[in-house]
Each structure stands twice: as structure tokens, then as C-alpha cells.
Amino acid sequence: MSPTVLLSFIIGYFLMLIVVSYLTSKKSSDNDTFFIANRSSKWYIVAFGMIGTALSGITFISVPGEVGNLAGSQFRYFQFVLGNAAGYFIVAGILLPLYYKMHLISIYEVIGRTLGKVSHKTAAAFFLLSRTIGSAFRLYLVAIVLQRFIFDEMGVPFWLTIVICLLLIWGYTFRGGLKTIIITDTLQTVFLVASVFLSIYFICHSLNFNISQAFHAIKDSHYSKIFFTNNFVTNKFHFTKQFLGGIFVTIGMFGLDQDLMQKNLSCKNLKDAQKNMLSFTVIFVIINLFFLSVGALLYIYANREGIAIPLDATTHLPRTDYLFPEIALNHFKGVPAVVFMLGLTAATFATTDSGLTALTTSFCIDFLKFDKNKTASEPQMVRKRTLVHIGFSVLILLVILLFNAVNNASVVSAIFKVATYTYGPLIGLFAFSLYAKKRNVLDKATPIICILAPILCFFIDKYSTVLFDGYVFAEELIIVNGLLTFIGLLIVSKKKPIEGIN
């Protein structure tokens, strides 16, 4: 399909989002609207919209691609998804009640109230680092596809593609913030979910499969193995590692992440927020299973038609991230190509827009103390918030350009590797603040501990086969990271004096 035609559909899509942004923010664009949507969001709208935020372009492209990669991933990712589901239940049962009880805007205020100001800013800084990297990775994923299949043929350089993407996001988020994003993410989730089912339909149609035949083709293929239970020590795909990693990555990347928790905190009350979480979890598991099914069908189709996995332009090695766009845009074309591109755009921008808003919120609340500023006028605060919003947009641009210069790994592996190192300290900090309330931590030592823990984890991971008799870490390394942070805080803390005793 012509790049111009694809681009015209994408432009139309963003014009729709900008119109929605105008309609949702014309009555109010103050900071209360931007940060917490006036705490008036409907739980079922939040639940559905969060699907698009949680899945992102990572799921849309890389998960189907990983099904048939040379490492033999197959459906092993579903083990991780089951761990995610367990993690969501933990978040709903433990963290949400805490956040609502404390009536928070930024969830990192929990750390400030229990451990101290330095610990508070350390937690927020680790979130800013984690979310900046995560948002940049996700936007990078869609940008390289847009570049390869649309902008390269137009002679547009990669850096300009990123600038255009960020300007579009900024255009529909800078006024309404979270209130706008809750609505736009719901619309984007509609496009995302529709594109999954339509992709399955188009692939099945090309293979002359009905639903039953497609199910049996996937089941009988060598792509559909879910549970890996052999070689616990050396197998990264072992169920225990994937399941535990899924739980703790969810706690870190969801429950301790301002982005996704900000949406939950916009619900009217705790009960609504918990209904939102439980509904979201069920849909999340089902949608991921469909994404894996898309992957299996893509490889079945590719094998039948003799389609090779496209090569990376830099490394000249097969890159599974490109298989889905290659088939959708160069082999199916027409309506399937448009469906794919809109689905990919929705998946990625639903994540990036809310990430940008959460970064702005955290910086404004945790560092600039907007909620405690009683002297500045509302217009002054809004102007300052807008500058912060622009600043993070520029930062994400720079990080993406850096990724483009050095990245040659699978995006899925890279994003969760980053999460393992940056969210571990958050887990340790929150765990200590919740379960070591009878101890006073040396507040100034917190940043050092939170930096040392990931460094130690890096070396533990690198030399694990030597240190632990051949053991190979997977996503469960985040548990070790959090535990090291907890132990470090324990070492630099002391028991609180008993009241009434000198």
C-alpha cells in the first residue's frame, strides 16, 4: 500500500484524538484536571482504556514475533502473563487501599511520609528514569516501523519522524492531561482490540481457515507450547522464573508506577478502583492470548508462503519485530495494512501519551511540590506544568535517538531487562516502608543503596552461572534487586525508640 495512503489514515486518526482533547479540556484545563481527572472517572472506562496503556506496541509487534524466534519462545510469554495477573490481584488488594487511604496524587508520597524526603525523591527519580526509558522504548518500536514502511520512501529522516510523533502526542495531552487521556486511551484501545481480531480474520482468510481450523492449526503447530518445566537452573523460560518474574514486574511496573496508578486514583473511590483492576486483569489475559495466536498464525502463513523474517538494517540479522508489519503491509496490503497500522499506532501512543503525563505529574508533585504551593496563581502553575511537559518530550526524543544509535536486541527483552534494574529499588523501598515501620532509616543513604542494588544485580546476572552452579536468571532478577534494596535499607536503619521511654 502507498505510504501516502497509510500516512493519511494516521493523520486522520490523530485529528480525531485532538478533537477529543479539545472537547474534554475546554471546560477545565487546570492542574486538578491534568493530574487526577478531578477524581471523577468511571471505573469501566478506566479499565478498558488501561488495556491499551498496559499492552503497547511491545505487545502488538514483538510478542507475535517472539513466538517463532530462534530461541524457541513459542507461547512461553503466557507464563509471564499469568504472573502479571497474579500481580494485579496483589496490587488491587494491598497497594490500592493504601493509596486511597492516604489520598495521594503522586504514589511516591508514601515513601516521603514513612522514610523521609530524600527517600521520597529517590523513589520518584527512579520512576522518572524507568518511565522515560520505557516510554522511549515503546515509541521507538512504532517509530522504526513507521520509518521503514512510510517515511523512508518519503525521504524523511528518523529524528524528524520522532519529532512528529511527539508533537502529535503533545498536541492532544498538554491541556487536558489525564482527563483527556482516559477518553483517548479508551478510543485507542478500541482500535487496538479491533485490529487484533481483524488481523486474525485476515490471516485465517488468507490460509482458508475457519475458527476451528485455525485453533487446531495453532494447537498442532510447534509454536503453541505454553509451559516450560524442564531444566529449572539453566532454562530462562522455566515456568517458575517466568511466573514469579511476571508477579514482581507487575508490582514494580504497574503497582509502583505513577502512570498506571494515576488512572486508578482518578476513580471516585477504592471500590471502583478495585473493580477496574479486576476487570482489566481478565481482559488483559485474554487479549495477550490472542496476540500469541496472531504470532503463531503469522509464522504458519510465512512458512506456507515462503516469507523470510526481515533483516535489521543495522545488524543485517533476522528481526522478528518486523515480521507482522512485513506481512500486513507488503503481502496483505489494502484494508489489513490500514488495520495493522492503526492498531500499532493506537497501541504505542496509548502508552506513550499517559507515560508523558505521568512523568509531568511526578516531577510537578514530587520535585516542584505543586500540591503544597499556596502562593502561585493557577495560570502560573499551568504555565510551569506545560514547560515540564515540553521538557520530558525533548528528553524522550533524545533517549530514542540514543536507542536508535546503539540498539540491536529484541525490544521485548530490552524493555524487561531495563525494568529489572530500575523497578527493583522501587519494590525494595515500598516493601521497607510497609513492613519495617518500627525502624528509622538513614534517609540520606537511600540513593546510594538504590544505585548499588542494580549494579550488584548486573554482576549477579552476568556471573550467575559461576556463582550459582549454572543458574540463569530471567525476569525474576527483579526480586533479587528489590531484596538487595530492602536489605541495604535494613542495614542503615535502626529501631525507633519506644514512646515514653528516654
Name the predicted role of every residue range:
Residues 1-502:
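Membrane-embedded helix-loop-helix hairpins and adjacent transmembrane boundary segments
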